[in-house]
Amino acid sequence: MRSTDAGAYSVRPIGLVSSSRLRPVDDDWADVAATITLLPPFDQSSLAGLDEFSHVEVIFLFHVADPDAVSTGTRRPRGNPDWPEVGIFAQRAKDRPNRIGLSTCELVAVHGATLEVRALDAIDGTPVLDIKPYMTEFAPRQRVRQPPWSHELMAGYF
């Protein structure tokens, strides 16, 4: 497929999240423990060597976000009138196109086909689309820049 071809893509979950968080909440994820259990055909061999990493990147589906409420324009993050209107791609809202989430979280342990993680901001039953080991070489090499409102927004997130 050429990069200019547009169309629908299908993905399938590779695992499911089990967590004490049953609903999306915007803050206090730092100490939330969760497990990710792989679905067939993936098994413990798919996780071989992952336990040598301290963190993983988890790509998941915001499955409870209403597909008909997806934001495409500007809005104030969390509806806060003190913050500027910004486009959906300038924020990390749940009701985004394709409803895809990405989280870097601590890998606590690997048991068979199950990962124990901490600070994964996904709720119970969340479909996991992919898992990647976090490697510092993929972190930005330049100084990270972000607007002041984003620091305020994230102050209590983790």
Model-derived segments and spans:
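Glycine-rich, low-complexity intrinsically disordered segments
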Residues: 1-158
